[in-house]
Amino acid sequence: HFRLAIMNTDVRRGVRIKKEEIMAVDFENSQTKKNLEAAFAGESQAHTKYEYYASKAKKEGYVQISNIFTETSGNEKEHAKLWFKYLHNGEVPTTAVNLADAAAGENYEWTDMYAGFARTAKEEGFTEIAAKFALVGAIEKAHEERYKKLLSSVEDGSVFSREGVKVWKCLNCGHLHVGATAPKVCPTCNHPQSYFEEQVVNY
């Protein structure tokens, strides 16, 4: 809880007594939390926007300006991370928590947000935008399903283990390992198991 201390005095029998009145504010219901959420949203938006600006400046031949936009975008990203961590007890949550949160966010986007946006755009005569809202909503649905599947893999310990023989690829050096489970350590570059993924050939 954030606490505000207010000092005042009380006079009793000629003795000046200092009292401290403590007003406790629950963080979850505080204006400060709302301000942190607004700050996180604003900085995140600025980070993304400046990346677009940097790309445009570079295309127009302003390399120095592009670099400044890129640098500032990085600053905004760190500002956003600072506020995000305050909103989550001083740290980024675990991957399992993040996957669950991401799935919930994607669910809201495709079931509520984009569905409503598409309906409104269509009613207002913006048919192209309505169609784009609907198409992106379908993508968000796929995102939700992917996050849920990944969360299930984290929870049941199958991220680095599969039924049957699989080919695992080290994302650092490209080493290929055949087996049901990825090796604990890459025998070629010594990177940990976390660098392995099941190889999927799509060419």
Regions found by a protein language model. Name each.
Residues 22-203:
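Non-heme di-metal
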Residues 10-17:
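Short, low-complexity, charge-dense intrinsically disordered segments
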